[in-house]
Amino acid sequence: MKPDRDAAEEFFEYDAEEFLVFLTLLITEGRTPECSVKGRTEGVHCPPAQSAMPVLTKHECSDKIPQCRQARRTRSEVMLLWRNHIPIMIEVMLLPDCCYSDEGPTTDCTDLNDPAIKQDALLLERWTLQPVPRQSGDRFIEEKTLLLAVRSYVFFSQLSAWLSASHGIVPRNILYRISAADEELIWNFSQTPSEHAFPVPNVSHSVALKVRVQSLPRQPRYPVLKCSIHSGLAFLGKRALEHGEGGNQAGDNRSSLRLPRSPLFSRSLHPSPPSHSPLNTRKCPPRPESPLPPGKAVKWLYSRLNGGIDTPPSEPYSLCTNGAESPKTSRTESPIRGFKSLSITDPLVIPSPSSISGETNPLIGSLLQERQEVIARIAQRLNFCDPTAPHLPDALFTSQEPPGHKTTWNSTQDKECLKKSKDSLFSVPHPQNHNGNSLEIPERSRSSLFDTPLSPRTRTRLDRVDRESKTSPKPATCRRLVLSDQSAEGSLIADAVQDISRLIQERLQHSYSLLNGTYKLKTSQNEQVGSNHGAQTNGFVSLSSHKKPTNAPNGEESTDPHISHATKCCRSPDSSRRKPDCSPRPLKVASLKLEDHSVTKSQPLTASNHQHYVSRESWTSLKNNSSHASSPQENGLTQIGYHQPFKNRVAISEKEAEKHVRDGSTCLEKDENQEPHSSLSSTPANLTCNISSLAPTESNQTSCGNWKKQTRHSIDGTATKAFHPCTGLPLLSSPVPQRKSQTGYFDLDTSLIHCRGVPWAANRRVLKRSQDYDESQHQILSASAPPANLSLLGNFEECVLNYRLEPLGTVEGFTAEVGASGTFCPSHMTLPVDVSFYSVSDDNAPSPYMGVINLESLGKRGYRVPPSGTIQVTLFNPNKTVVKMFVVMYDLRDMPASHQTFLRQRTFSVPVKREFNGQSNKKTSLGQGRTLRYLVHLRFQSSKSGKIYLHRDIRLLFSRKSMEVDSGAAYELKSFTELPADPPFSPRC
């Protein structure tokens, strides 16, 4: 029987209290919702993942941030319970969206037994953290293992799945409650919970930590929670009306709306309006005429139809729930009870995921409202182009509730009261509509919607729809907002909605008419342009898509905004200023279709392109391939007919091209928004490459940028090439002298430059050969690189192990089993192996494989091994057959704490000479004839307490086949293990 480990020698990476705080924060902040594809993220107070890189910027807590204040409160509560040896219980619950704000319930303990929280909350998880006596024996786990297990459980929990499926939208109100585990349970699971027990690590020399969690079974869909207090809007509307008429009466009625004051902290992604109406919720100060009792907050819910976003409501149907505090408290400085704002960014308010009718999809209302807002925004932007168009009220940017939902206002008296209250609001003069009728809307609704904060997803959709509305020649259909006929302003808003539809259709039809005439210029105009500006264009005629139309008083200039660039060059600078443009954002054409579909796209005309060198060969090829020209070359101008095939209209002399490059005509100053296919490339080489039908020749120069964008996949993203293809110089270190003899490693063939598989072999610059060059004496030479036998730095072994050679490909399915033995035997680990192969010769000879075993998945420190003993690495191929078993003996007992070193074992096959005439020849020397067959590279590091770990990775070199030697030759395998000598160990970084 193995003796127990000495407790005094055991090293604990965390303090017991600190580890418990990390564990609690991982549970409470590990699923912080955010509006992203993942839908959630880890809070700033969560412990960093063990396998991740060190955090570059460490978070510093501030008392002004609610999350930091709540994290400090959580820390104090956990430490208080732990120091008194009391088990800790963490409960995770959901609350309905209708009556619980983003601040959550208060943190006092007076209303812990409030029946509302008992009925409304849905218990999801119950965690129990209990101290137990220290575990003994060799089968132990460390604190980081428990952290990894809890992080994995939190990542794959039901709550994380809901957040991921909704991209962080639902659930909105997540509550966490920390209490003593021996207290009476207040909440129970709606179904029989499933329980999971985690491994028990030792957190100190005398105490271990036992963690278990009970969770609600997996649900097929997100539950729609109903509020037990607010059953309908009629009740809420009556409460709001009573509150508007008398503050005392409203204060009495708020007793039933009061939320429990329990040690709960809540997270809410968005302010939560009632489930059937897209009402916006904002924190607003209480009204002066109705003072509130101390410690009580009010949440005002008001429609964006009658008010701006950041303006407190003044209409009676603002709904009173739990909400804001005194006006002195800003939005960012919410009380401590607002534990964590679930959204890193404050996105646009999204309606409730469910309706009174019981919608099952929580995202439908959000998508519909966002789409209607986008359409309304487009209409307002198009409205800027027409100074005679009526003003569009900002309230149109939120869709109104359908008439069918008005049935929830089941009281006739409530409706009459609401109408009376609304009539008192419309007293501010407002711009008139196109019929001359005055629209009287409250002044606060005049706030610009371009100042409204948008979520990244909404902003992306808005930009995409903006682009589509400017490019599509087909008039878009405007979604009509459903309005109530019973409201006082219903008819006025309906007229404004019709204006939206009219503006969109008129603007898009006008754009379509302009697009149709984009490239339909008359032949006479083209000839006039060519005769007047032939000296300036020098063989280049380009088209430019100008956005602003220019009209001359005499009518000579075309009103078409899409004119030839040559005409633009001769136009006076102030000609475009004769007619002011009322549009701050003119229509921009992003994609146009020409009548002639044979036009090939080329790069836009830019001034920077004229700095490139023009080779005579490429222009000679272009001139020879262009069979037809629209004008003689002696005129110095190439005219392009707009109704002829493109390949039959290009004829440019090389003299004109060189002159164009030297002079740089004024036509370089073109519109930056010009279409790529509406201009010829100013770079002759680019023009030759882009028009494949005209110039199928191949360029001799290769850009260095293309070399960086090759689609070669490295092992871990850190692989680099040995030499730069343009300079020929080594990238990582200086060249080494030429080897006079083979070293016995994976030596390279001298004709490596011919290998088609090497990524940089095809990108070498070669000397041009003359016309009478003899093919028999052909030898590819480098312009600046060292000889071919120096193409790799050192040898193949060093280049591959240090990622200096790019692999040709990877092989999936290899695995390895890593184990160790010595004073103790750690558990064997089976890990995947990233295997890649290379090409090292021109005869397609098989190259060895390189395998990388990543140990970072085992934790930051790696795989713990005894100070001395044996390490065994068994490599399996995809067929689960053993390829090689590496057995390495080591002794690192002299290694100091917080140091590192490495170990490399090589296995060679050394042939043995046969006996001739009864005489036995000696074996060949170690440097002659030996071939490297296998290699294993191990990295070791020691912790602060002197424990030895295999860390980072294990790198292997092994043969493609089992043994690549002559079957008739005598050989033997020899292994050599090497360690650094001076110094043998180095301090850890």
From Swiss-Prot:
Region (Disordered): 244-295, 393-477, 525-639, 656-686
SMART domains: DUF4210
Cross-referenced Pfam families: Chromosome_seg, DUF4210
Region (Transactivation domain 2 (TAD2)): 876-884
Region span, Required for macropage invasion: 792-849
Biased composition (Basic and acidic residues): 413-423, 460-471, 656-675
Annotated keywords: Nucleus
Biased composition (Low complexity): 254-270
GO CC annotations on file: nucleus
Domain of life: Eukaryota
Subcellular location: Nucleus
Family per similarity comment: Belongs to the ATOS family.
Domain notes: The protein contains 2 transactivation domains (TAD). Each of these domains may be required for transcriptional activation of a subset of target genes.
Protein's name in the database: Atos homolog protein A
Organism encoding this protein: Danio rerio (Zebrafish)
Lineage: Eukaryota, Metazoa, Chordata, Craniata, Vertebrata
Gene field: atosa
